[in-house]
Amino acid sequence: MGIRRIGLVVPSSNVTVETEMPALLSRHPGAEFSFHSTRMRMHTVSPEGLAAMNAQRERCVLEIADAAPEVILYACLVAVMVGGPGEHHRVESAVAEQLATGGSQALVRSSAGALVEGLRALDAQRVALVTPYMRPLAEKVVAYLEAEGFTISDWRALEVADNTEVGCIPGEQVMAAARSLDLSEVDALVISCCVQMPSLPLVETAEREFGIPVLSAATAGAYSILRSLDLPVAVPGAGRLLRQDSAVTAS
């Protein structure tokens, strides 16, 4: 089968997804992966900064296509969700169309679409969120997920505008925000609604503490990549979402 080649389109100041995604998929029992990134300039997570970043998408898609990936993940969740309900479908379709014009058959996923996909895979209706965003952007994320049919029971915005600083948010701060949520009637917790906010070491710990499925933008992205490649979803130590097919691979 060979090494599965994954393309990542990331904000220039994002370093976490390029750390957490390889760490996750390196645990897969049946496949090897390589990761190849292209970058869109962005430092401040604001409507203006996100719009300027999204304007660079076509250039980045052309560049990443040269690496001939099997799957491309558009790895900035809020940049898609600020576009309004259903934007992940439009972005994924536009990128796929651009790739096809250039002769690439790469599959296309987005962090925004992957989170929706992951929550549905967990059959979650009532959801709680921890986001790093300023409150107005966090409200757009909440509205986006509610438009997808989820009930956002409670949420927290850590209100960090500098994207480099988002990548340095301590795990203790993320867990403190999660503990402040009302999780009494929640089906799932998104402990990091952002691929730049580090959370991979927290997912299993939070699942044990809270007794509910816990996922992140990174684990949802890994789930979507594996499903797109028709690979078993069996990644240990990363939460219930990535154990969907563990019994199958064990047998």
From Swiss-Prot:
Keywords: Isomerase. The modification S-(2-succinyl)cysteine is found at residue 76. InterPro entries: Iso_Racemase_Enz_sf, MaiA/AMDase, Maleate_isomerase. Optimum pH is 7.5. One of its GO terms (molecular function) is maleate isomerase activity. It catalyses: maleate = fumarate. It is an enzyme of class 5 (isomerase). Its EC number is 5.2.1.1. Transmembrane segments: none annotated. Substrate binds at residues 14, 76-78, 133, 163, 195-196. Gene3D superfamilies: 3.40.50.12500. Changing residue 76 to S: Reduces catalytic activity by more than 1000-fold. No change in substrate affinity. The active site is at residues 76, 194. It comes from the Bacteria. Changing residue 194 to A: Loss of catalytic activity. Belongs to the maleate isomerase family. Catalyzes cis-trans isomerization of the C2-C3 double bond in maleate to yield fumarate. Shows a strict specificity for maleate, with no activity detected toward structurally related substrates including citraconate, mesaconate, dimethylmaleate, and maleamide. Homodimer. Reaction is initiated by nucleophilic attack of cysteine at the double bond, yielding a covalent succinylcysteine-like intermediate. This is Maleate isomerase. The lineage of its organism: Bacteria, Bacillati, Actinomycetota, Actinomycetes, Mycobacteriales.
